[in-house]
């Protein structure tokens, strides 16, 4: 068999169809591409039609519903062999399994069935099987021809081709069926399980729940009752009047309908119900530095389930075919869940609402990294690395493996257009515009989640970033699949002529809801999803501040939460993010802090060069802690435009220790993750993680303190700067009034030693002592720093009487460098510290008698 696969199909933008006129067949051969005329041909050729202007192409229901692909051809000059072929917009090519013989001078009908998945069509240059996905996405199609007799390879011939025909299938009344439901009989508590199955029907858009809605239901008498969200909890009574009074002319949807959509009561099925999803397996290989993923086999249906307690549970499938109205329930199947010590999903702690815990009650203090992209163009420029290769998930594999070894336990991952967005511009390979999701990217996201789980890392999943709705800040609106003025607007089925309308247009809301349903179905049961972050820097979208003043951002976030929350099994943490330090977050408090449904506060902590990172974090705590929620910085590292490498190294080091001793709910996530990776700075994280071993900030609410003293000596004047210890206990925080004036501005007085500490109940004291200026900008060589000697601390007299172990830590290795025993009887006692050059950390813990 000899055939020539079609190359660069996506670049051919012919428009052969006009009204009822005959199609213009294109002839592709070794001589190039030309219109088929009466010319004589020799050798092998491809005779084909395109789907028209590529910028206008959308999946075609006519081809999806076609029974077969039929073409009538007449050859003159010699006998020919022929095969039909089809390809999608990305050049995924299929050729008919059947070989046709075209007799010289005779009209021949070439016909190949289209409806049988996995049959009649052979993949060419890839491993995907024939299915409805390809059938609906046929962009170009035609015939491959070559002389039947090798001796005729130079014999000239002519051929005539009639317009192709796609006869439509007829409804046969076959009942809806579930096929090959694979469900394990045993499961493990707090370990996610995937269950696959198929249906005997294919769907034009299997991602659209208005066409096909597939769910699974749980009959579990021991299950925790999920609260039904009530819209009024999201301040709807305050927001709706504000929105109603400020409607603009283009906000055409009646407010009554928006209010109805917002305040709708959830359907209350008899059993717990969660969405299933449509998926596809892929093969992955590296071609030099490029990651190549190829679909393999047939698509499938699946659901993911997280059993939360041991015992017996019954599960069943629910399939609602909305094209016919059929609703099918499978019989219940009983599975046994074995008890395990798996920790389960992350929650806000019920013991101390400023911190996190696992479902089993274990304390979780995330040591964080922001891996928003595998390659960052700003890093390449700032650090003068040159353009780095995009290695896809191979880069994430390297990052996450290194993070796991260093004790980093949380990574921020973006579903960005350059990483793992499942919906984007049809111009891009693998994407289908509005409502048609990238199965390849979903598979890649699965791989990232598997790598995270293997390395003990939890993922802060960011659904959207500001550039998607901006034409000025990291602008991507031009390529947004909803942009009706974009180049591929028709191909995307775009609906918005202005990015600002995203927040109030009902069709845009429905589109976002369907996408979030898929996200919830695929990753909402994964206990390694730390949280859902709805937006990164949402204030930077077009007219973000105006949308906030008018209440639309508040309104939209309320809708989004109410929509996605009931579809999530494991994920309990929700938040959104704005650009800027704590005062910016405070300014947008109605979406960042105040909503009770939003569980924690995220913010940036970029800084001016003269501000120490630890001081910046204390500032954040003072202005944001009034909400009584965990605080996590998800972007930091010098200024937002980058800084010197030594300043960034100072931030990497100081942020870890500064976060712990300022009451943050986890360590900040560095934006410049590739800087840590290429400079191999993971030892900072590993040392901190070792220090954190055995610490539990839940059992006793920590009380924090800070002071700074100038080193005495001929070059310095003695000076002491004392701050009143800050009590961050829950009760005090909840009574505190929010006030930006709570910020204080640190001052550096020569070579100062800063001392941050916390007490945990009456039996534990922790401290970090550091040279203030030298940890703000890390010296090139620590060995050049003179030793700090003679440092002592007062033994905390508030601790219970008894025997205590003092452990002093090297903050660069996590090693214990000095230990001593102290008997505390209530008298004032000094604890002498060994010399250090940059900083040191210690723990004083009561020795419990056996």
Regions found by a protein language model. Give the residues of each.
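Ligand-binding face of N-terminal immunoglobulin V-set domains in extracellular IgSF glycoproteins
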Residues: 189, 274-337
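Low-complexity, Pro/Ser/Thr- and charge-rich linker/hinge segments at domain boundaries
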Residues: 170-184, 332-360
């Amino acid at each position: 068999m000899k055939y020539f696969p079609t190359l660069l199909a996506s670049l051919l933008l012919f428009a052969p169809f006009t009204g009822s006129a005959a199609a213009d067949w294109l002839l592709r051969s070794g001589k190039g591409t030309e219109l088929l005329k009466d010319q004589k041909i020799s050798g092998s050729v491809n005779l084909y039609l395109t789907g028209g202007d590529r910028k206008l192409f959308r999946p075609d229901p006519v081809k999806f519903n076609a029974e077969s692909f039929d073409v009538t051809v007449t050859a003159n000059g010699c006998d020919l062999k022929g095969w039909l072929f089809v390809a999608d917009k990305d050049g995924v090519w299929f050729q008919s399994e059947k070989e046709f013989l075209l007799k010289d001078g005779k009209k021949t009908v070439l016909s190949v069935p289209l409806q049988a998945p996995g049959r009649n069509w052979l993949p060419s240059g890839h491993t995907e099987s024939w299915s409805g996905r390809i059938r609906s996405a046929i962009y170009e199609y035609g015939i491959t021809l070559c002389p039947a007799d090798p001796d005729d390879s130079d014999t000239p011939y002519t051929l005539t081709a009639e317009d192709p025909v796609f006869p439509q299938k007829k409804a046969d009344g076959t009942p809806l069926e579930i096929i090959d439901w694979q469900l394990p009989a045993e499961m493990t508590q707090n370990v996610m399980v995937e269950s696959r199955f198929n249906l005997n029907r294919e769907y034009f858009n299997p991602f659209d729940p208005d066409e096909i809605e597939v769910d699974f239901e749980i009959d579990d008498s021991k299950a925790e009752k999920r609260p039904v969200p009530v819209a009024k909890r999201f301040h709807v009574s305050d927001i709706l009047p504000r929105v109603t009074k400020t409607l603009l002319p283009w906000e055409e949807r009646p407010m009554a309908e928006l209010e109805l959509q917002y305040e709708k009561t959830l359907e209350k099925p008899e059993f717990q119900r969660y969405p299933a999803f449509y998926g596809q397996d892929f093969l992955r290989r590296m071609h030099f530095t490029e990651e190549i993923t190829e679909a393999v086999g047939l698509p499938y249906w699946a659901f993911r389930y997280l059993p939360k307690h041991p015992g017996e549970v019954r599960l069943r499938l629910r399939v609602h075919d909305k094209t016919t109205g059929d609703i099918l329930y499978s019989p219940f199947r009983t599975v046994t869940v074995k008890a395990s010590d798996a920790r389960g999903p992350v929650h806000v702690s019920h013991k101390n609402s400023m911190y996190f815990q696992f479902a089993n009650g274990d304390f979780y203090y995330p040591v964080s990294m922001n891996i928003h992209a595998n390659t960052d163009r700003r890093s390449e420029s700032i650090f003068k690395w040159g353009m780095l290769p995009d290695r896809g998930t191979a880069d994430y594999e390297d990052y996450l493996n290194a993070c796991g070894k260093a004790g980093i336990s949380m990574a921020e991952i973006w579903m960005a257009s350059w990483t793992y967005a499942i919906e984007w511009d049809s111009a891009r390979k693998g994407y289908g515009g509005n409502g048609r999701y990238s199965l390849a990217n979903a598979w890649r996201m699965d791989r990232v989640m598997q790598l995270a789980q293997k390395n003990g890392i939890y993922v802060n999943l960011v659904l959207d970033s500001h550039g998607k709705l901006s034409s000025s800040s990291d602008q991507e609106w031009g390529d947004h699949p909803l942009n009706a003025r974009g180049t591929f607007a028709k191909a995307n089925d775009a609906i918005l002529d202005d990015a600002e309308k995203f927040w109030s247009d009902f069709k845009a809301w429905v589109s976002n809801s369907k996408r979030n349903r898929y996200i919830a179905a695929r990753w909402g049961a994964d206990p390694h999803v730390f949280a859902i972050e709805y937006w990164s820097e949402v204030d930077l979208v077009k007219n973000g501040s105006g949308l906030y003043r008018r209440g639309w951002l508040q309104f939209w976030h309320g809708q989004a939460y109410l929509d996605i929350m009931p579809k999530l099994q494991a994920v309990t943490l929700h938040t959104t993010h704005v650009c800027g330090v704590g005062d910016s977050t405070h300014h947008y408090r109605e979406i960042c802090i105040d909503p009770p449904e939003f569980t924690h506060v995220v913010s940036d902590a970029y800084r001016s060069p003269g501000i120490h990172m630890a001081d910046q974090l204390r500032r954040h705590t003072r202005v944001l802690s009034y909400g009584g929620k965990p605080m996590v910085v998800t972007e930091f590292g010098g200024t937002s435009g980058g800084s010197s490498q030594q300043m960034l190294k100072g931030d990497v080091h100081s942020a870890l220790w500064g976060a712990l001793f300022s009451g943050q709910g986890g360590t900040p996530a560095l934006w410049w993750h590739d800087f840590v990776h290429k400079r191999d700075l993971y030892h900072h994280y590993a040392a901190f993680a070792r220090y954190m071993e055995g610490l539990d900030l839940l059992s006793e609410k920590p009380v924090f303190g800070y002071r700074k003293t100038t080193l005495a000596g001929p070059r310095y004047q003695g000076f002491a700067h004392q701050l009143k210890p800050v009590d961050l206990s829950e009760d005090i925080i909840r009574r505190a009034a929010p006030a930006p004036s709570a910020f204080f501005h640190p001052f550096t007085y020569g070579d100062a030693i800063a001392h941050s500490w916390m007490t945990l109940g009456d039996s534990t004291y922790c401290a970090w002592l550091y040279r203030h200026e030298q940890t703000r900008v890390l010296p090139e060589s620590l060995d050049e720093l003179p030793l700090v000697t003679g440092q002592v601390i007062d033994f905390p007299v508030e601790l219970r009487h008894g025997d205590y172990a003092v452990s002093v830590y090297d903050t660069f290795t996590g090693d214990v460098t000095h230990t001593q025993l102290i008997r505390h009887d209530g008298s004032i006692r000094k604890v002498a510290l060994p010399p250090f050059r940059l900083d040191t950390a210690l723990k004083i813990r009561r020795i419990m008698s056996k």
